[in-house]
């Protein structure tokens, strides 16, 4: 009889563990899908359309940009980064340049209101005639928070240059 109780207890605990794991996995997939649609797709859209205000709206008011991919290792408010990027958005909106950004991820962790996303972004910029001005792959980490039903960037960390091979490995 003790063996039966032990067996049933073990079976019940296993069932509960599997059920919890499946529920967590489904919640993770839902969060990732929501972030893909409402955050990363919005970043890509705003860059492509030159929608500066739309891009700015994806950032938390206290967001920080960290860059260690070039010679100058820096950390500063996203508002400063946005001021530096604004002309590129305006040029894109006016058709003077064509910009595009894509994202791929190697790790995505979080819960209902926080997310830490690790991956690579691929940015291209062409002039109005289609000539390539800039192209680059960059390792990225982003810390996101969900406020009032909207995912916002709290910290973007542009870590290091990546290669096309690194990018392809994340397919």
Predicted regions and their residues:
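Bacterial Sec-dependent N-terminal signal peptides
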Residues: 1-27
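Short, low-complexity N-terminal intrinsically disordered segments enriched in polar/charged residues
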Residues: 21-57, 170-171
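A short acidic/glycine-rich loop-to-helix N-cap element
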Residues: 27, 128-134, 163-169
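A solvent-exposed, acidic/Ser-Thr-rich amphipathic alpha-helical stretch
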Residues: 30-34, 38, 52-113, 132-135
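A mature extracytoplasmic/lumenal domain signature
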Residues: 59, 69, 119-121, 157-158
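Generic short beta-strand segments
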Residues: 64, 119-126
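A short, structured loop/turn motif at beta-sheet edges
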Residues: 107-115, 144-151
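Short beta-strand edge/turn micro-motifs at domain boundaries
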Residues: 137-168
């Amino acid at each position: 009889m003790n063996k039966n109780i032990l067996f049933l207890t073990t079976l019940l605990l296993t069932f509960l563990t599997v059920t919890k794991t499946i529920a967590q996995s489904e919640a993770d997939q839902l969060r990732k899908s929501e972030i893909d649609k409402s955050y990363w797709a919005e970043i890509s859209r705003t860059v492509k359309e030159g929608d500066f205000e739309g891009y700015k709206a994806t950032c938390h008011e206290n967001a920080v940009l960290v860059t260690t991919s070039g010679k100058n290792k820096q950390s500063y408010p996203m508002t400063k980064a946005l001021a530096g990027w604004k002309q590129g958005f305006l040029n894109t909106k006016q058709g003077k340049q064509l910009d595009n950004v894509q994202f791929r991820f190697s790790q995505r962790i979080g819960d209902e209101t926080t997310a830490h996303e690790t991956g690579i972004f691929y940015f291209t910029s062409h002039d109005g005639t289609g000539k390539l001005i800039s192209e680059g792959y960059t390792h990225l980490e982003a810390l996101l928070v969900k406020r009032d039903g909207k995912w916002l960037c709290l910290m973007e960390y542009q870590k290091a240059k990546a290669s096309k091979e690194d990018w392809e490995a994340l397919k």
